[in-house]
Amino acid sequence: MPKTKIAVACQGGGSQTAFTAGALKALCQAQGQGRLKDEFEFVSISGTSGGAVCATLLWYSFMKGERPVWQRMMNFWEENTAQGPVEHAINRFIVESVRMVNSGMMPTLQLSPSSPVMQSMMEFMTAGQRMGFSDFRGLLEKHIDFAEIASWGPQPKPPVLMLGAANVTSGALAKFVSTQEAIRVEHVLASCAVPNIFPAVQIGADAYWDGLFSDNPPVEELIRPRSVGEAHIPDEIWLIKINPTASRRVPVKPGEIVDRRNQLEGNISLFQQLGHLEFMNDLILADAFRPEFLSRFDIKAPVRIPKSFHSDADKPYHIPCIEMPVEFQDLLDYEGKIDRGSENISKLTAEGEKAAAVFLRERAAAVAASSLNEDQTAGQAKSRGEVPDGLPLARWKDPS
């Protein structure tokens, strides 16, 4: 029986993507321990910002054939977490300073991350600290051998890695894809370059900012043969979501407004991409594509994707996404995305593992329900004397 092809898309969110690391760990453990009813394989992994870091670390371990495949990623997060009283004090100072600015209790000091003043301030605050705490590029290079990746060149075999960033000058939505070029540390840094924290990352003649301004995360491109290859079109896209879709209250305080605005901005491109995929899925169900075209890309049915909004009508190809429970979301704020305190990181990682377990159960139920509908529809067609289509997707039609 062929394995279910899975694309995993990891949304950005700074330190809160420790949740993503926990979720990816749980997914890999479930795959390796055979605890899923149907076997699956990761054919592609995409990510933006902190999601790009998690995706790259996991992809690198896959490429090297490491076991457990998630260990390198978790080692990175352990070293990226504040350690000892001095680092925790620096971390608290940064987080609380930003919180006071966002709440209106402290005036905003607008400094460019490229300015000598800002660079001197950061050097002073992190002087004598571990590289893992003070040197993001150095930390990435410690856990990923980019020289080794360069020696590989473009990698056609799965999983395909795709990182999102934004071209500052042209405005183009940039994607760095492992099938097209060797992944560089600059690609990861570009995807993480939040403008008010990091300077734009120069790659060749172009400069890049955080992927929040492009695809957060890349989703639509995961089904395009030009990016992932004809053999790696996924059957399902598993989304690890950081920014909540809904809010239980209208933000009134300055800090609440900053937080909700950041969440909405982080979801705009995601919902647009999911909307495009829904439209494509509906066209497939309407027989808008020739069977030979679908067969060329091994498309037997619509790609399973999550809804954009919980209030959207249910469709046979919908599956849940991996997201934080509402009660946990209520405890977080914008400043938590820069909080590298050990308590914050460990809670996020643990919540990610639990959310992945919930997702696997709910996904299995959704797939089983749609399969039951397929069988019922096929049985009704047979009883009416209809000749079934040669493709399995004909059985996805809602019974009428």
What are these regions (language model features)?
Residues 1-48, 53-400:
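Patatin-like phospholipase
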